[in-house]
Curated annotation (Swiss-Prot):
UniProt organism field: Erwinia tasmaniensis (strain DSM 17950 / CFBP 7177 / CIP 109463 / NCPPB 4357 / Et1/99)
Free-text function comment from the UniProt entry: Endonuclease IV plays a role in DNA repair. It cleaves phosphodiester bonds at apurinic or apyrimidinic (AP) sites, generating a 3'-hydroxyl group and a 5'-terminal sugar phosphate.
Binding positions (Zn(2+) 2): E145, D179, H216, E261
The encoding gene: nfo
Protein's name according to its UniProt entry: Probable endonuclease 4
InterPro entries recorded: AP_endonuc_2, AP_endonuc_F2_Zn_BS, Xyl_isomerase-like_sf, Xyl_isomerase-like_TIM-brl
């Protein structure tokens, strides 16, 4: 069974994100557990934690259906020691927040070398950052998202994801999330069923489906292999609807959160309903 939803707002409290997901008739959702554009946030209170857990229970969302996202400020491959430390501390806080809320996944963008260190050195730092944080937490899997490769961001090649995983000691607590827009902008074709078959055969060969913990379902305003990250509504961009229909019919994508980050929240409910209908 597919878990399908969207990245919903947590404005007014994390429990409100659950309500918003339910209103969309979503079977999955993503959220930020704190303001994604700030380093620090007030600790989660017992009251907030309880409200979130009760809302999940009420609307029947299990941790397997929820894919929280970390702050955009974090760079686990930062070339500067002080900034790297700050990112690691912030990521540890994000993992702890997930643990407190009873969540088992945390999605994050791997990191950027900022033209100051080599790609290999940056990938090593990212793996080292994950090891440090996993050693200081329990029960939460670090989920690496592929990127479009804008600027000096790494993670746009499946080989980058494989290299990071290779450097992680506890492989039971590391996974990946594939964003369709990022993959397309990063040079992986998805414009036809045949292209999807080939792209995910490459994913299986280089990374492996055993590490797939989530998907971000986005069409692309950006051109193929442009290394530009611009999302679009399903069927409105350069990928087209065939890829999303194909994904819905492939059992390898069952049981993981599949999250819309498309550009028009007004049609999320319709997009979710369409995706559900394509499973047949």
């Amino acid at each position: 069974m597919k878990y399908i939803g969207a990245h919903v707002s947590a404005a007014g409290g994390v429990d409100r994100a659950v309500e918003r997901a339910s209103e969309l008739e979503a079977t999955a959702f993503a959220l930020f557990t704190k303001n994604q554009r700030q380093w620090h946030a007030a600790p989660l209170t017992d009251e907030v934690i309880s409200a979130f857990r009760l809302a999940c229970e009420k609307h029947r969302y299990t941790p397997a259906q929820i894919l929280p996202h970390d702050s955009y400020l974090i760079n686990l491959g930062h070339p500067v020691a002080e900034a790297l430390e700050k990112s690691r501390d912030a990521f540890l806080d994000e993992m702890n927040r997930c643990q407190q809320l009873g969540l088992t996944l945390l999605n994050f963008h791997p990191g950027s070398h900022l033209q100051q260190i080599t790609e290999d050195e940056c990938l090593k730092r990212i793996a080292e950052s994950i090891n440090i944080v996993l050693n200081n937490t329990a029960g939460v899997t670090a989920v690496i998202e592929n990127t479009a490769g804008q600027g000096s961001n790494l993670g746009f090649r499946f080989e980058h994801l494989a290299a990071i995983i290779d450097g992680v000691e506890d492989k039971s607590r590391v996974g990946v999330c594939i964003d369709t827009c990022h993959a397309f902008a990063g040079g992986y074709d998805l414009r036809s069923e045949e292209a999807c078959v080939n792209t995910f055969a490459e994913f299986e060969r280089i990374v492996g489906f055993q590490y797939l913990r989530g998907m971000h379902l986005n069409d692309a305003k950006s051109e193929f292999n442009s290394r530009v990250d611009r999302h679009h509504s399903l069927g409105e961009g350069n990928i087209g609807k065939a890829a999303f229909s194909w994904l819905m019919k492939d059992k390898r994508f069952d049981g993981i959160p599949m999250i819309l980050e498309t550009i028009d929240p007004e049609i999320w409910k319709d997009e979710i309903a369409w995706l559900k209908s394509e499973q047949k």
